[in-house]
Amino acid sequence: MSLFDHSVSELHKKLNNKEISVTDLVEESYKRISDVEDNVKAFLTLDEENARAKAKELDAKIGAEDNGLLFGMPIGVKDNIVTNGLRTTCASKILANFDPIYDATVVQKLKAADTVTIGKLNMDEFAMGSSNENSGFYATKNPWNLDYVPGGSSGGSAAAVAAGEVLFSLGSDTGGSIRQPAAYCGVVGLKPTYGRVSRYGLVAFASSLDQIGPITRTVEDNAYLLQAISGIDRMDATSANVEVGNYLAGLTGDVKGLRIAVPKEYLGEGVGEEARESVLAALKVLEGMGATWEEVSLPHSKYALATYYLLSSSEASANLSRFDGVRYGVRSDNVNNLLDLYKNTRSEGFGDEVKRRIMLGTFALSSGYYDAYYKKAQQVRTLIKNDFENVFANYDVIIGPTTPTPAFKVGEKVDDPMTMYANDILTIPVNLAGVPAISVPCGFGANNMPLGLQIIGKHFDETTIYRVAHAFEQATDYHTKKASL
């Protein structure tokens, strides 16, 4: 039995009873990485020397009263979150040699909570992708079946947790990039409310949509991690001055009287039968615990995919303009003048998907097309947000599948961008609305690949979605299932 089969609270008891040490936890992580990483490929960079030194430092503090909330816990960090002195590439060749000189706010908070960073996790390049096949270095595989994708863009973050390489990880979610890989890998992933967690030090893809969040084995551990990283940050003007609740205290298991909305659009056309049936079965479980549900409509959801790709690509085209070979990152050797430097560095450094989105965004923002595309997409975004607010006026949470299907095979959709993009049709509306949502395991498809249940909450009401997710988790045994890697 792996130490990572235990929860944070259980591991803390073992540490305080001197049954294990922080060094034991760190060595467990690196031993597992040594055993499976050649197949999974979840990590881009390991930080073994510093992690072992940190473990020894923390071992001397075991039992101290001022220990952090996540004392001694090994964590992996998605490679678009900057780490001082630890290479951060965004899985892009254009940043292959980039070593940041500061920590992201979430990394500072993890250090204050006494975690141990094991390494940086693989992802789709600049967080653009749904399968991890867009990594500029190598693709991560799904620990449940290496022939299948782990999802994206936080595929490495989800796969590392599912494979038992770390206890938990950080990902980022722009259109589903935490929840979709969590569903595909049979783990728990939360996209917090926009502004709940500081984005300072997150390499921006789409600044109005990006949000950092936790990926864990259990809902309780997820609440622990969000507790540690939440809160206003003076370095991020978009972080919200909203009180952070006690997420752990909210895990009561009580859903009696809970009002659940189930959008008909989330169970209709484009959603596979396996995903639909798993959600209906989950609703029966919650009904048996005293909750009620009704079908509702989010009528503008059908426009979400087009709206998202116009807005996110427009923001990406602006954000990625800074990668020009002048200030940091890889610089082309094929240069005769400044224009060559810009053109060749970006042509050689960016992958095909990143180039595709930069071109789409540049077009949408160009003179003569701005009103027809970008401005109109912003107006539709407002309609989508209003749909959620109308539903939440009468219901506590919205529930549906996280993804239309279980994970698909490696290479199956890589040559068809539109089919690939459609994997996010159920997660994208949440980002456009800025509300929080969690994915928890809720079953398996015919290929024995995991399915996820998406629970969506009101703005800054992570407490309620944690309570519902935890109640469902404890009433079922899906969270006890492990990849047989």
UniProtKB/Swiss-Prot annotation:
Keywords carried by this UniProt record: ATP-binding, Ligase, Nucleotide-binding, Protein biosynthesis
User: What are its GO biological-process terms?
Assistant: translation
Q: Per the record's keyword annotation, is ATP-binding included, yes or no?
A: yes
Question: Is Nucleotide-binding among the key words of this record?
Answer: yes
- Catalytic site residues? K78 (charge relay system), S153 (charge relay system), S177 (acyl-ester intermediate)
According to UniProt, the reaction catalysed is: L-glutamyl-tRNA(Gln) + L-glutamine + ATP + H2O = L-glutaminyl-tRNA(Gln) + L-glutamate + ADP + phosphate + H(+)
**Database matches in Gene3D superfamilies:** Amidase signature (AS) domain
What does this gene product do? Allows the formation of correctly charged Gln-tRNA(Gln) through the transamidation of misacylated Glu-tRNA(Gln) in organisms which lack glutaminyl-tRNA synthetase. The reaction takes place in the presence of glutamine and ATP through an activated gamma-phospho-Glu-tRNA(Gln).
What's the subunit arrangement here?
A: Heterotrimer of A, B and C subunits.
Q: Specify the protein name.
A: Glutamyl-tRNA(Gln) amidotransferase subunit A
User: Which organism's genome codes for this protein?
Assistant: Bacillus mycoides (strain KBAB4) (Bacillus weihenstephanensis)
From the broadest rank down, the organism's phylogenetic lineage runs:
Bacteria, Bacillati, Bacillota, Bacilli, Bacillales
Name of the gene this protein is made from: gatA
